[in-house]
Regions:
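Catalytic nucleophile loop
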Residues: 1
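Surface cap/lid and interfacial helix-loop subdomains adjacent to catalytic sites
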Residues: 4-159, 164-166
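Extended, compositionally biased alpha-helical segments that mediate assembly or anchoring
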Residues: 138-139, 201-204
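Extracellular low-complexity, Gly/Ser/Thr-rich intrinsically disordered linkers
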Residues: 142-198
């Protein structure tokens, strides 16, 4: 849609950003523009507009395998982008995750997570887990991915790991990473970024 209906047209200046969670967006190696989107660069700062943000999430302790589907492309002259909505300029940053409080989050299970050790009832539709996750874009095993660190504290009553892996019984599909919660991990960061981009867009008199 961006390449065919937006780039090179007046509507391109009206786009704050395209947030393409869990998607391989290709650029020439070492560049922030080209290949998939010829005129739409990667967002590298919060006040940038008419740009693209894309990421694929993996546990820091379980990076993408060499045969993984995310974070890489077959052509060695190209690579996928990684832009963390919580820190577009790079580096490790706390991400502000928001999860649905009901039904299975991502492990393809039917039961809801136990958000607290005493399984206290949750009455809100979403759950925040402040400080539980931090993430940064890294290159590992030839893949550019969002590496997710879990800051679990076994001593506190809160859930230590929400899940998000693709599982088939006991088997974990490592090449999928945390694809099922790509959006949830940075949900509030995406929401918070929009008014910043909107203010920048208005300031330019678009």
């Amino acid at each position: 849609l961006i390449a065919e209906e937006i780039e090179g047209k007046p509507t391109a200046t009206q786009m704050l950003s395209a947030m393409l969670a869990g998607t391989n967006v290709t650029v020439p190696k070492g560049k922030d523009q080209g290949a998939d989107f010829k005129q739409t660069p990667v967002c590298r700062k919060a006040g940038q507009t008419s740009c693209v943000i894309a990421w694929t999430s993996f546990r820091e302790t379980s990076p993408p395998p060499a045969n993984g589907r995310y974070g890489r492309v077959p052509d060695p002259a190209h690579e996928t982008i990684c832009a963390n909505p919580a820190a577009l300029g790079g580096g490790m940053a706390t991400v502000n995750a928001r999860f649905p409080s009901g039904a299975g989050i991502g492990d393809l299970v039917a039961d809801s997570p136990r958000w607290t050790k005493d399984n206290a009832p949750i009455t809100t539709p979403t759950v925040a887990v402040p400080g539980l996750y931090a993430a940064q874009c890294v290159t590992v095993n030839g893949a550019n991915v969002l590496s997710v660190r879990i800051n679990a504290d076994p001593a506190d009553p809160r859930i230590d790991d929400v899940g998000g892996d693709v599982r088939f019984g006991a088997f974990v599909a490592q090449d999928w990473g945390l694809h099922l919660i790509d959006v949830s991990l940075v949900m509030q960061d995406m929401v918070d970024l929009v008014p910043v981009q909107l203010a920048a867009w208005k300031a330019r008199g678009r």
